[in-house]
Amino acid sequence: MRRKLSTPTAKTSRRLRTGAKKDYPLDQIRRHLETGPIVLVSSAWKGKTNIMTMGWHMMMEFTPALFGCYIWSGNHSFKMIRKAKECVINIPTIDLVNEVVGIGNSSGEKLDKFQKFGLTPVAAEKVEAPLIAECYANFECQLAEARMISRYGLFIWEVVKAHVATSPKNPQTLHYRGQGEFRVAGRTINLRKKFKPQNL
């Protein structure tokens, strides 16, 4: 049975502490992903949805916006995402740290993680996988390259739609350090004047 998806509203969730989201330029998504935050990957296949926690990912190209990530073949999300050939990369902030850990500790094979962790699925514009309303940013992805999936578990995605909250300006994203420790971001240091233009 297909899960009913919500439409984003001001009352979407008690944990939604970001500003309203707006469309975001695809060639600028690197500003949110190149810093290496923990992400939540949402997927959908044959009426079922799932979420997984991920820390291994990288920007690969800016235009078009290509994004690579590793998914272990034994993960339930691996099977769903490989079949669907699409997903949503969602960026949580410190408000969702317990959900990030809980999602990473559980399998979606027999569990509805949206329901279990009180997260709100919102219909995406270009993919079937839902956005996670409580996350600061959501990037809709379609599979761009599949040749390295079987051997390395490496998926290469094209981001086809991006949604980023208008506030806070400096979100407190999570960065995993191993051994159960996270570093929390939030402060931005602007050294643009010191960069060569081609290196920006």
Predicted regions located by residue number:
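Basic, polyanion-binding surface patches
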Residues: 2-200
